């Protein structure tokens, strides 16, 4: 793959090394001063009287047009003002971006105008006699609990997988068979980097498989130190590269952990701080990758990070057409279909992938990769109606909204770093 374009200064000329270093230091310092938890706490405090034991976006009495709704709108405007004041210091903070999107959703939901009165600041000082305990602030390293407390609902999740020769199921339910060799990024966002390396199953063979997977969990404030996990065929470790099995010594270090369901063939990595679970398997001398990730995390990337197989599927030039997939291989197609049908009765994309892999490789054990990929999808998908895919030859195009995400993310990051 080619290198990403070099960053440019606002005036168009390449910035010097010292300028880049200064900008990185400033942005890093700003990141460490993010006050989003204070904004969250003030919002929860200001809505306590509006709730009857429900979530912050469920006002008590009066409906959307009642007095409680008016109080909620004032609280939301205060919340939005607080996030704007701390925006420059919250670059790359998942809690901040989640709060901004949540405020927008709630203001639309409750028909709140952007202009208007705000809630009074929360009272300071000792608790009054007889008052109950202060509301608990959600653990910043428990993504699902924090999201549910903020939005009053469970977060959305996306699923991606790569297995076999290799086949990719993208976040948007595209299903491609790829001709890729070498290292390709499955994910590359602000929190997570995943790279898969494919090579021929043997010298001169037409079939390629994933032989190596590298995962980088990027440093995240009080939650985890940066951790690297690397798996290769016949070497599926039960620890990160530094020998640890969690996110380090930070307060939220336990929010990243490795578990082994079957040593040497099945590893599960849970990253609760970003609402993510990853399964890596080894079957028939190949690796497979499967992930369930929070939507906010999957979409947190810039224009320079747009080449991600989990986001856009295989590049068009690297996709195998239907005619290429149906060419005769080492095993006859009818024989491969019979072998795959035993474990995959539905003739969906997983079944077709199995037929291709068994036919091209000549190895009946390739049926296991497709079967376990389907099993993982059954676990990870929130909507099982999307379990079985029957894709067209090219796969559905990305919607304009999805294509705009990298551009908008890049503009937002630039604004945070350079606005004054």
UniProtKB/Swiss-Prot annotation:
Residues recorded with modification Phosphotyrosine: 43
Q: Where in the cell is it found?
A: Cell membrane
Modification after translation = Autocatalytically cleaved at low pH; the two chains remain linked via two disulfide bonds. Also proteolytically processed by TMPRSS6, several fragments being released in the extracellular space; regulates HJV activity in BMP signaling and thefore iron homeostasis.
- Signal peptide annotation: 1-32
Composition bias type Low complexity, residue spans = 125-134
Q: List the disulfide bonds.
A: 141-223, 160-310
Q: Where is the lipid attached (GPI-anchor amidated aspartate)?
A: 393
Q: Does the keyword Phosphoprotein apply?
A: yes
Please indicate which residues carry the site annotation Cleavage: 165-166
Q: Which UniProt keywords apply?
A: Autocatalytic cleavage, Cell membrane, Disulfide bond, Glycoprotein, GPI-anchor, Lipoprotein, Membrane, Phosphoprotein, Signal
Q: What InterPro entries does this protein's entry cite?
A: RGM, RGM_C, RGM_N
Report the Pfam families cross-referenced here.
Answer: RGM_C (PF06534), RGM_N (PF06535)
Q: Where is this region: Disordered?
A: 113-135
Q: Name one GO cellular component term.
A: side of membrane
Q: Which GO terms describe its molecular function?
A: BMP binding; BMP receptor activity; coreceptor activity; transferrin receptor binding
Write down the glycosylated positions: 111, 206, 365
Q: Where does this chain mainly localize?
A: membrane
Q: What does this protein do?
A: Acts as a bone morphogenetic protein (BMP) coreceptor. Through enhancement of BMP signaling regulates hepcidin (HAMP) expression and regulates iron homeostasis.
Similarity comment: family membership = Belongs to the repulsive guidance molecule (RGM) family.
Q: What is this protein called?
A: Hemojuvelin
Q: Supply the source organism for this entry.
A: Mus musculus
Q: What is the lineage of its organism?
A: Eukaryota, Metazoa, Chordata, Craniata, Vertebrata
State the gene name recorded for this protein: Hjv
